[in-house]
């Protein structure tokens, strides 16, 4: 893991993310940053303009730039905070899964603002030092959000030009290509919804035409009333 790919629009939380990367991520990791001219203090930073209009296209652009130099990257939202253990734990989990010869899709960090088992509030078993027992396990799942997530170049599939549902569609397309997704033991704090906002109705309606055009099967499954 030698590269981080970040896309931002308003950069509201970017200073905090940069501080945590500076403190906790190895210095030989390269940061690819779209949408800001900020240079991370201790890391080589490759900056580029973000001329896109949605999450999917923004991350396709910055990931493509990172993949020109590296075969595996960590995709990060601009509103997360690393802990002292995030990078090491994620790296350990990726190495373990590679050792099991699993065709990897995403290996995603847990968070306090995510869905399903990716959310630290959703767990099973007894509590161990303020954590659910399952938080110390790598869990296979169908869909993750790449809030902070590892992916290989040969596994990556372009996001559709979406804000909402981009994760769902892309994860499914990667599964269709034979890849498996996992939730790591690693954790990042996630502020959440800093770019797209909280207007769920508008975000859903905006996604429908794109999904209908590119994946009518999913449109029928998710939106067509019976």
Q: What would you call each of these model-derived segments?
A:
Residues 85-105:
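Conserved donor-nucleotide/metal-binding helix-loop-beta segment in metal-dependent transferases, i.e.
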Residues 10-24:
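Short, well-formed alpha-helical segments that are part of the catalytic scaffolds
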Residues 2-13, 34:
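A conserved hydrophobic helix/loop-capping motif in glycosyltransferases and polysaccharide synthases
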Residues 105-122:
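Short beta-strand-to-loop element that shapes/binds the nucleotide-sugar donor at the catalytic cleft/hinge
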Residues 130-151:
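A recurrent flexible, glycine/aromatic-enriched loop bordering the glycosyltransferase active site
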Residues 70-81:
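Short beta-strand-to-loop acidic/aromatic patch adjacent to the donor-nucleotide binding site
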Residues 49-66:
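Glycine-rich, basic loop-to-helix element that forms the pyrophosphate-binding segment
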């Amino acid at each position: 893991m030698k590269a981080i790919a970040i896309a931002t629009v308003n950069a509201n939380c970017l200073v905090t993310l940069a501080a945590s990367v500076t403190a906790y991520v190895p210095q030989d990791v390269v940061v690819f940053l779209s949408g800001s001219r900020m240079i991370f203090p201790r890391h080589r930073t490759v900056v580029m303009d973000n001329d896109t209009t949605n999450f999917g296209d923004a991350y396709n652009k910055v990931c493509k730039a990172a993949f020109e130099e590296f075969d595996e990257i960590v995709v990060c939202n601009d509103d997360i905070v690393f802990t002292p253990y995030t990078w090491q734990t994620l790296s350990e989990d990726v190495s373990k899964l590679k050792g099991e010869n699993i065709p990897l899709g995403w290996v995603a960090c847990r968070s306090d603002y995510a869905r399903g088992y990716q959310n630290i509030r959703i767990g099973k078993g007894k509590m161990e030092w303020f954590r659910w027992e399952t938080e110390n396990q790598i869990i296979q799942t169908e869909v993750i959000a790449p809030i902070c997530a590892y992916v290989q170049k040969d596994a990556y599939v372009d996001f559709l030009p979406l804000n909402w549902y981009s994760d769902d569609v892309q994860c499914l397309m990667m599964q269709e290509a034979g890849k498996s997704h996992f939730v790591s033991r690693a954790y990042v704090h996630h502020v959440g919804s800093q770019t797209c906002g909280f207007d769920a109705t508008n975000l859903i309606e905006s996604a429908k035409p794109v999904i209908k055009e590119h994946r009518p099967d999913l449109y029928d499954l998710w939106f067509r009333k019976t």
